Design a protein with these regions (language model features):
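Bacterial N-terminal signal peptides
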Residues: 10-21
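Sec/Tat signal peptide C-region and signal peptidase I cleavage site
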Residues: 22-26
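A short, glycine/acidic-enriched catalytic loop
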Residues: 102-133
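Caspase-like cysteine protease fold
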Residues: 30, 205-283
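Active-site-proximal C-terminal subdomain of hydrolase catalytic domains
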Residues: 138-236
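Amphipathic alpha-helical coiled-coil segments
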Residues: 307-325
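Glycine- and acidic-residue-enriched helix-capping/strand-helix junction motifs
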Residues: 37-53
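Functional beta-strand-loop-alpha-helix junction segments that form "active/interaction loops"
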Residues: 52-94, 294
Length: 326
């Protein structure tokens, strides 16, 4: 399935050799894990959230880079094998996104994400992330007590009771979102439902760029959770947290993506996908700004902007030619 973003362009046909100058696009590998639901209503909620998240993922990455685990297939052994393969497939510029949708537990020392058979521990999750090439890998954990997972991965003690979340850790290898601020918030959470909802919501797209970033999805979900407890007239039993850098630049979904008709012009389809790939390269470059330094960052950004403008003109020229021939 090809998913592309609708564009408005200016006409001018440029040399096809221009595309040869565009570097290979870094890949986004997305893994959606649906854990044990237990009661039927929780199972239904997790089913719905996983489907919404997977649909959003398909607006950003190809089907072969989206892997879904649910039911009896969502085992610890299967996940360990999957991430071992990711470690072989991914390059230094690639990124990974891991969604953990389900229940969790914390006994005061160890966090576990509930799966059929042996559970995934926080140490398991950290080991999976540590083994991946590159940095800025994203994890969403919607379970109760998920804040305890953040504590182990970052090495920074989780806040207790009504304390504020600590500042980000020094590493930028991880971008972590948890439904709770620590391991003491043990009730089933609402955060995952609203986070999934944000991925297709124009209300969540604060900067109106047709992309939903980690930051935008987090802010939307946090506000909806707060409103839920306010409307219910009850004390909040969950307080989400976001840790790490680059949340505003890490896109999770693309709004208004369209599926090309079967009879669409193959050249236009290819050019639109290449235009979207350039958009993704700009987002990835933004994540590396501090690493590159301002001068090199601006040089690469200018180059990408010029290529984007030139490719945009090629697309419009091709659209004009295609329309004239109909």
């Amino acid at each position: 399935m090809r998913m592309v973003k609708p564009m408005l362009m200016k006409p001018l046909l440029l040399a096809p050799l221009l595309l040869a100058a565009v570097p290979a696009q870094a890949a986004l590998y997305i893994t959606v894990v649906q854990g044990l639901g237990g009661a039927a209503d929780y199972q239904q909620q997790f089913d719905e959230q996983s489907k919404v998240i997977s649909a959003a993922a398909k607006t950003l990455t190809s089907d072969d880079k989206l892997t879904e685990f649910s039911g009896d297939a969502a085992t610890r052994a299967a996940l360990l094998a999957h991430f071992a393969q990711l470690n072989q497939n991914m390059g230094e510029d690639d990124r990974a996104a891991l969604y953990l949708i389900g229940h969790g537990s914390f006994d005061g020392e160890e966090y576990k994400f509930n799966l059929p058979g042996p559970d995934m521990t926080a140490q398991d999750i950290k080991s999976l992330l540590d083994a991946l090439p590159g940095r800025n890998h994203f994890v969403l954990n919607t379970s109760s007590t998920s804040g305890a997972m953040v504590e182990l991965i970052t090495g920074v003690p989780a806040p207790r009771d009504d304390a504020e979340a600590p500042a980000d850790s020094s590493t930028d290898k991880y971008l972590l979102v948890a439904a709770t601020r620590n391991g003491n918030e043990r009730n089933a959470t609402h955060f995952g439902r609203y986070f999934a909802e944000a991925l297709s919501s124009e209300d969540a797209d604060i900067n109106k760029n047709n992309n939903i970033s980690v930051q935008e999805a987090y802010d939307y979900a946090a506000l909806q959770v707060e409103a839920y407890f306010t409307d219910a007239g009850s004390l909040a039993t969950e307080h989400s947290q976001l840790r790490g850098s680059g949340a505003a630049q890490f896109s999770l979904s693309r709004l208004n993506a369209i599926e090309l008709a079967p009879d669409a012009d193959p050249l236009i389809a290819q050019l639109l996908e290449e235009r979207q790939a350039l958009d993704t390269q700009v987002e990835e470059l933004q994540l590396r700004r501090s690493e590159l330094g301002n001068t090199e960052y601006l040089r690469q950004l200018q180059e990408l902007i010029l290529r984007t403008a030139e490719l945009t003109e090629r697309i419009e020229a091709a659209q004009g030619t295609s329309g004239a021939g109909q």
